[in-house]
Amino acid sequence: MDHKMKLTDEQQAILDGSRGETMAKVMETLVRYGELFGADEMVPVTSKYNHLVTSFGLKALAPVYALMDQLIDAGAVSAQKFSADPRPLDPNVPSNFLQNFVFNKFMYTKQDFYEGQLKKLGLMNDDAFTCTCYMDEVGNTPAMGDVLSWSESSAVVYANSVLGARCNRNSGIIDLMGSIVGYVPSFGFLKDEGRRASWIVEIKTTKKPEAQLLGSAIGMKVMEDVPYIRGLDRWLGGKLDDDAKTYLKDLGAATASNGAVGLYHVENITPEAVKYGESLIKDDARVYVIDDAELKRVYDSYPVIWKNKDAKPKLCFMGCPHMSLNQLISWTEKVEAALKAAGNERVVIPTVFTAAPGVLKAFEATPYAARLKKTGVITSYICPLMYMNNPLSTKMPVITSSNKLRTYTSARYYTDDEILTEITGGKK
């Protein structure tokens, strides 16, 4: 193929077919992809593991399965082991006969087949299904400066922002292809200039803002640009500890889904902001001030798309993206306290907390697991979004504190305190 990109001798040889026709097509796809975004070269993928966004065996993805078979047959498998987004099904999650019929007979009919393909291509292990692959309990945590070939938006924004890795918001399949050849096109967040901020976000709230609400406000304002966030460090204790990482996990997912943010900097907190400070800010950066009134305006702007806006919720999902271990522990305590205050022993709405399989195993090893189970809350490894994609689930009045789930489905957003009141039967 004709191309303008400067390739190394090895890269050009792969493109010319030195490693077979299939590998040449993979390289050609990446070169064409890179040139669309102005990439001038291909750079090595340096992370230990990859992460794939496509984890669900939808019947409609027949072309994907055919492509996967072609890659497997040609020996064009991933040069890295990889994790993948969450599984779409879990029998522990409440669903009726008709929902299960749609899930198993019309939607995810190829799940087992597709997981078999993933294993042949390089899946880390049977538990490597989560959108929060970067958690210690999962083991796919890139180092600062690592070049990645990921595509899951909430994982990309976390890796770029909280870990200081380098990754563009790639698409599904492109993520796998970068891992197969070991190179990705260099543009966007892989470049120093692409990581500079064109927005300054000033946090002037009177209390710690809800991560999912703050992330939503930032995402809708800056869209795909890079924000430099000031004033948030006072609410995060001035350090990047586990609680701060959990907060930024949820904030980032909301910026990425309510907008298209792939990288943000938090002054005095995130690694590049600590290292480079205000030099990350572009000279012509715009300013966005977020105070209590602005967060209320954003909250009030969310549409409620339930057929009956006053319907009693039939299900609550927490964990989009998947919850961390410290979230599971803290929410156990919150639910217990709220139930006691409400005079109830168990949640009054079926409630599901979702987390990575590895995180759930760690949680089960603590005394909190039995305490949470006693409240009636269910834990699961499921992807709530994949559950909500069922047309019959869409018709259900489902509540969540995830702005990502609100954006992509019919689920209704509530703040954490509102969720607690709803699921425990407290006074409104």
Regions found by a protein language model. Give the residues of each.
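Non-transmembrane, aqueous-exposed alpha-helical and coiled segments at domain scale
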Residues: 1-317, 321-428
